[in-house]
Amino acid sequence: MSEVINLSLSQRANHLSAHLYNNQEAHLPYSKTATVDYDNSVFLSTSKNPNGTVNYSPRSLNYDLTRGYGSLGKYEYYESKADILGQYEVIQTGEKMDKNEYQKALDKGMNKSNTLNVNNTKYWTDYNKLIYSPKSLNQLNNWEYKPHDFGINRSFPNLKFDTFNKGKEEYHQYSEDSLENFRNTLEQCDLIQGVNLISELDSAWGGFTNELLVDLKDEFFNNGINSKYNIWVHGLINHNLNPKLNQLYSRINSIIELSFNSTLFFPMNLNSSSECLGVKMSVIEDELLRGFDKRNIVNEIKIHKNKQASNDFGMVDIDRANLYNLVDNIKIKDKPDSIDLSLSDSKNSKYFAKSYIIPNDQSLAESLNKKENFPINIYKNNRINDILNNDTFPNILEDKSVYSEFSSSNTLKNDLKFYREVIKRSRENEVIEDKFELIEKISELIEEYTIGYDESDEEYDSN
């Protein structure tokens, strides 16, 4: 299987990527006699040492604010402390963070995952296992990370990294380095199958990510004309956030622009899962789009319990904001059948396409085919549940067998109509640069997700 380049932008996105790569690490062979039955080259880069051993590192470009990397130093595992002190002027800009016990143990070749808890995993680097190349770690120097809040400007603390336009402006300071780092990563690939981006939609990261994506398409993918490559974007929505008007504008801007600039867009009410691993990106994309390239928003995403595998199963009903972070043992309130990460309410949905990724379970496949009254796509992945057994993955499930659902339905139209009304009633401001162009793009998407005649659209056009 060919390679995927992952771009992860923001602390929350980096938490999800850390779980993705910890899952990859669990499949690495640590002895010459180990059986390798997993394609580690999809998400990991390799380099050989003189003694014949192989180093694996994430094929990833991570972006975070100052102090967002916690205790991890950019060159920590590539240069000795003496070399750094001898060659560079070291400027201390804040209190140095100490590693937690888990990371100290990893440095000594030991695993102490039992020491991890909600208090010592505030940063994704607190439980990350793999060593990143220095070129993978990119920092926005003008902004400082603040847990549970938007980042703040280091010169003007009252300014927050909170709106689409701020991210858009900030990107241009890093455009040359971003393109060069991506080029270096791309040159290490033999046959790239696509690019996977994870970012936030409610903050300035949406604008930053969109500008980066536009540049990548223009520089490397013939401005999107070349359909050979898959560009997937996973957009994280903070469902706990009661957005102020500017944050709502930013969310709308991010959803519309990123959907127009990607080949498949997954807006999620919080988590990005790695259940797709092992299935070729182009296959899933073709089946979900079904020839409608502009209908590329996957607005319903669910993780279901596999009843075929267990009769005693429950999903923990928790605050989904904790899914990307490690959590303490959680008390079970009830046992819902699924975790719903969808952007849209799935009630009364009429589906354009629906895909399932399941374990190698023929009875489950037959059950799903009987349940649906229209053609569906079922992909089997024997590794879908591996991440649930990873020692750094949060303990959110009672059982260890799930499958995932990705759907495109007409219910997205209702969300889009709400967004259009919000923008229509807005005044021109710095967050919305071109109000009428944005309304036009939203209207275009509404048409794609409309089945049959819609009287409300006729009323809108007459206004």
Curated annotation (Swiss-Prot):
Cleavable signal peptide:
none
SUPFAM superfamilies (UniProt xref): Tubulin nucleotide-binding domain-like (SSF52490)
Q: Any idea which UniProt keywords this protein has?
A: Mitochondrion
The subcellular localization recorded is:
Mitochondrion
Asked if the Swiss-Prot or TrEMBL record annotates the protein with the keyword Mitochondrion, the reply is yes
Per the annotation, which location comes first and is thus the protein's main one? mitochondrion
Q: Which Pfam families match?
A: Misat_Tub_SegII, Tubulin_3
One BP term from GO: mitochondrion organization
Q: List the disulfide bonds.
A: none
Q: Which GO terms describe its cellular component?
A: mitochondrion
Report the InterPro entries cross-referenced here: DML1/Misato (IPR049942), DML1/Misato_tubulin (IPR029209), Misato_II_tubulin-like (IPR019605), Tubulin/FtsZ_GTPase_sf (IPR036525)
What family does the Swiss-Prot or TrEMBL record give for this protein?
Belongs to the misato family.
Q: What does this protein do?
A: Involved in the partitioning of the mitochondrial organelle and mitochondrial DNA (mtDNA) inheritance.
- Protein's name according to its UniProt entry: Protein DML1
Native source species: Debaryomyces hansenii (strain ATCC 36239 / CBS 767 / BCRC 21394 / JCM 1990 / NBRC 0083 / IGC 2968) (Yeast)
Name of the gene encoding the protein in the UniProt record: DML1
